A protein has these predicted regions:
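Structural signature for extended repeat/solenoid scaffolds and their inter-repeat hinge/linker regions
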Residues: 1-430
Length: 430
């Protein structure tokens, strides 16, 4: 095996081995209508009503953040917390030591450290790891995420997926999940839907920039064009990747005014689409995928006011397939994102007990939510209110071993979200 070395005064001679839009949307074949897909939203309990939409500035539904040093949130096992002082060089030394040699890696540092880092800290750690940990006669820097994958893929595949996706960082992990589905069981389209749908144009841009796969010239668009078959689901995905979504804010960061004339037209078009005997998906995709959250929120409220019906449910009834799944994901996020994500976690926890292949859903969802501590806190509160139990307890019961411990760590909404840092200083004694 090749060997790695860490070039740091702290580590000394530490070594580590073991690294080994083509046609138009309207002309797309209507295959999703003919291909039933029993996905997440068809397996979940009813969605919340748009009448319960919280306003953007309504903070009454959220409890204040826990004081530093606690994250008890009602879970049965109280977690003691301590401030983590971030030192990328020290962490690099710990992780390289843990991953070294041909023996089973010491996974404790992975479990204790990786879930606690912000995206920015992960990026800093990856750069430091490549700078300090070298391999081969040419002393090339080692990619931390790839090192984790190489050392754990046979030892503990589930822990590998969880720790590898965190080590990729926020945006590359989404690119990983977006193209993960076609590498194995191609029925796991939720991984693709949840990585891309409902994102801002800026987020989509970051995900595309982070995508790496030489087979597709590091182009996520090329990957989707080649891997997805020609249907309206594919056209919806490419529409998202083309960054065609209405912007929520202007260049000065101000919320864009809602065009209520366009809202009325969209409501009429959507009503016509869900009531038509044939077709209708093209109109639904075009509107739901391309409108901003605030515009969609206005559509849902006006639709319910006019027709006393929940459009999200009507759309899922109309399209019991991939198109219905992607529309439901976007709309549920508009209605109430914390509740939607609590529902998705509950679904993943239940599904992973029955089907080992569905554990990727639980991992991907926990990794996604943990990057935003405030959102994770809101999700945990929504989970408790909806299911009358703590998220950490539910995850602990549904998982096992070290990957389960890693998932529990992802559930911790760390407050404050920024981690303390000590800068190295020098001083002299007179």
């Amino acid at each position: 095996m090749s060997s790695l070395s860490v070039n740091t005064a702290l580590a000394g001679g530490l070594t580590a081995g073991g690294l080994v839009a083509g046609a138009s949307l309207a002309n797309a074949p209507p295959s999703p209508m003919l291909e039933s897909y029993y996905g997440t939203y068809q397996a979940c309990s009813p969605m919340p009503s748009p009448l319960l939409l919280p306003s953007a500035d309504d903070g009454r539904a959220l409890e204040p953040l826990s004081p530093l040093g606690s994250d008890n949130e009602g879970d049965s096992r109280r977690r003691s917390r301590r401030a983590r002082f971030h030192d990328a060089e020290d962490i690099t030394t710990q992780l390289a030591q843990a991953l070294k040699s041909s023996h089973r890696p010491d996974t404790s540092p992975l479990i204790e450290i990786l879930p606690s880092l912000t995206h920015e800290q992960v990026m800093e750690l990856r750069a430091e790891y490549k700078r300090l940990v070298k391999t081969g006669p040419e002393r090339k820097g080692v990619n931390l995420a790839k090192h984790i994958r190489a050392r754990l893929k046979d030892e503990d595949p589930l822990l590998m997926k969880a720790s590898y996706s965190v080590a990729l960082g926020r945006w590359e992990s989404e690119a990983y999940w977006a193209n993960f589905w076609y590498q194995g069981d191609k029925t796991r389209r939720e991984l693709l839907i949840e990585s891309l749908m409902g994102r801002t144009n800026g987020e989509i841009r970051l995900i595309k920039e982070a995508f790496t796969d030489k087979k597709y010239d590091n182009s996520l668009i090329k990957c989707m064009k080649e891997e997805l078959k020609e249907d309206k689901f594919k056209k919806a995905v490419l529409m998202v990747l083309d960054e065609r979504r209405m912007e929520e804010y202007d260049h000065y960061g101000r919320l864009q005014p809602i065009d209520y004339g366009l809202v009325d037209q969209d409501v009429a078009d959507l009503r016509r689409a869900v009531r038509s005997e044939k077709g209708g998906e093209t109109a639904m995709i075009t509107i739901i995928v391309q409108r901003s959250d605030s515009h969609l929120r206005a559509i849902l409220q006006e639709y319910e006011r006019q027709f006393r019906a929940n459009f999200a449910r009507d759309a899922l009834k109309k399209s019991g397939n991939l198109v219905g799944e992607l529309l439901a994901h976007i709309l549920n996020g508009v209605i109430n994102r914390p509740v939607r994500d609590a529902l998705l976690l509950h679904h993943a926890i239940s599904a992973s007990r029955k089907d080992g292949l569905r554990r990727e859903l639980l991992i991907s969802r926990l990794v996604r939510y943990h990057w935003d501590p405030d959102h994770m806190r809101a999700v945990k509160q929504a989970y408790r209110e909806r299911y009358n139990r703590g998220l950490s307890d539910a995850v602990r019961e549904a998982t096992s071993g070290e990957w389960g411990m890693f998932c529990e760590e992802l559930c911790i909404a760390r407050t404050p979200p920024d981690v303390r840092r000590f800068d190295k200083i020098s001083y002299s004694v007179r």
